[in-house]
Amino acid sequence: MPFGLIVIGIILAIAAYRDTLGELFSIIKDVSKDAKGFGYWVLAAVILGFAASIKPIKEPVNAFMILLMIVLLIRKRGAIDQISNQLRGS
Protein backbone atom coordinates (compact mmCIF):
# COMPACT_ATOMS: atom_id res chain seq x y z
CA MET A 1 0.00 0.00 0.00
CA PRO A 2 2.76 2.53 0.74
CA PHE A 3 4.23 1.80 -2.70
CA GLY A 4 0.90 2.64 -4.34
CA LEU A 5 0.67 5.92 -2.45
CA ILE A 6 4.22 6.80 -3.50
CA VAL A 7 3.40 6.09 -7.15
CA ILE A 8 0.24 8.22 -6.95
CA GLY A 9 2.26 11.01 -5.34
CA ILE A 10 4.89 10.86 -8.09
CA ILE A 11 2.20 10.96 -10.80
CA LEU A 12 0.56 13.98 -9.16
CA ALA A 13 3.92 15.73 -8.74
CA ILE A 14 4.82 15.21 -12.40
CA ALA A 15 1.39 16.43 -13.53
CA ALA A 16 1.72 19.50 -11.29
CA TYR A 17 5.23 20.23 -12.60
CA ARG A 18 3.99 20.03 -16.21
CA ASP A 19 0.88 22.07 -15.28
CA THR A 20 -1.44 19.32 -16.54
CA LEU A 21 -3.36 18.50 -13.35
CA GLY A 22 -6.66 19.57 -14.90
CA GLU A 23 -6.09 17.28 -17.87
CA LEU A 24 -5.13 14.39 -15.57
CA PHE A 25 -8.26 14.81 -13.46
CA SER A 26 -10.49 15.07 -16.55
CA ILE A 27 -9.04 11.80 -17.88
CA ILE A 28 -9.62 10.10 -14.52
CA LYS A 29 -13.17 11.49 -14.45
CA ASP A 30 -13.91 10.22 -17.98
CA VAL A 31 -12.54 6.76 -17.22
CA SER A 32 -14.40 6.41 -13.95
CA LYS A 33 -17.65 7.81 -15.38
CA ASP A 34 -17.77 5.23 -18.17
CA ALA A 35 -17.04 2.28 -15.88
CA LYS A 36 -20.12 1.28 -13.93
CA GLY A 37 -19.29 0.32 -10.36
CA PHE A 38 -15.73 1.67 -10.62
CA GLY A 39 -15.91 3.22 -7.17
CA TYR A 40 -16.84 -0.08 -5.57
CA TRP A 41 -13.83 -1.81 -7.13
CA VAL A 42 -11.49 0.95 -5.98
CA LEU A 43 -12.98 0.85 -2.49
CA ALA A 44 -12.57 -2.94 -2.34
CA ALA A 45 -8.93 -2.69 -3.43
CA VAL A 46 -8.20 0.02 -0.85
CA ILE A 47 -9.84 -1.97 1.96
CA LEU A 48 -7.93 -5.10 0.98
CA GLY A 49 -4.71 -3.10 0.80
CA PHE A 50 -5.17 -1.77 4.32
CA ALA A 51 -6.24 -5.20 5.62
CA ALA A 52 -3.05 -6.73 4.18
CA SER A 53 -1.04 -4.80 6.75
CA ILE A 54 -2.57 -6.94 9.53
CA LYS A 55 -0.17 -9.86 9.83
CA PRO A 56 -2.57 -12.66 10.95
CA ILE A 57 -4.86 -12.16 7.94
CA LYS A 58 -2.28 -11.22 5.33
CA GLU A 59 -2.40 -14.49 3.35
CA PRO A 60 -6.20 -14.64 2.94
CA VAL A 61 -6.25 -10.95 2.02
CA ASN A 62 -3.61 -11.56 -0.65
CA ALA A 63 -5.77 -14.37 -2.05
CA PHE A 64 -8.77 -12.02 -2.19
CA MET A 65 -6.64 -9.36 -3.91
CA ILE A 66 -5.61 -11.88 -6.58
CA LEU A 67 -9.27 -12.87 -6.98
CA LEU A 68 -10.21 -9.20 -7.34
CA MET A 69 -7.64 -8.75 -10.12
CA ILE A 70 -8.84 -11.87 -11.94
CA VAL A 71 -12.46 -10.71 -11.75
CA LEU A 72 -11.51 -7.28 -13.08
CA LEU A 73 -9.72 -8.88 -16.02
CA ILE A 74 -12.52 -11.29 -16.88
CA ARG A 75 -15.37 -8.86 -16.12
CA LYS A 76 -14.68 -6.82 -19.20
CA ARG A 77 -16.06 -8.66 -22.19
CA GLY A 78 -13.40 -9.66 -24.65
CA ALA A 79 -10.51 -8.90 -22.30
CA ILE A 80 -8.98 -12.35 -22.76
CA ASP A 81 -9.32 -12.06 -26.55
CA GLN A 82 -7.69 -8.64 -26.51
CA ILE A 83 -4.80 -9.93 -24.41
CA SER A 84 -4.24 -12.90 -26.72
CA ASN A 85 -4.38 -10.62 -29.79
CA GLN A 86 -1.78 -8.33 -28.24
CA LEU A 87 0.48 -11.27 -27.41
CA ARG A 88 0.18 -12.56 -30.98
CA GLY A 89 0.88 -9.09 -32.33
CA SER A 90 -2.21 -8.86 -34.51
Curated annotation (Swiss-Prot):
Disulfide bonds: none annotated. It is a multi-pass membrane protein. It is found in: Virion membrane. Keywords: Capsid inner membrane protein, Membrane, Transmembrane, Transmembrane helix, Viral genome ejection through host cell envelope, Viral penetration into host cytoplasm, Virion, Virus entry into host cell. The keyword Transmembrane applies. The chain crosses the membrane at residues 1-21, 37-57, 60-80. GO terms for cellular component: membrane; viral inner membrane; virion membrane. GO terms for biological process: symbiont entry into host cell. Component of the phage injection machinery. Required for DNA injection in the membrane transformation event. Involved in the formation of the membrane tail tube to connect the virus interior with the host cytosol. Essential for viral infectivity. This is Protein P18. The gene is XVIII.
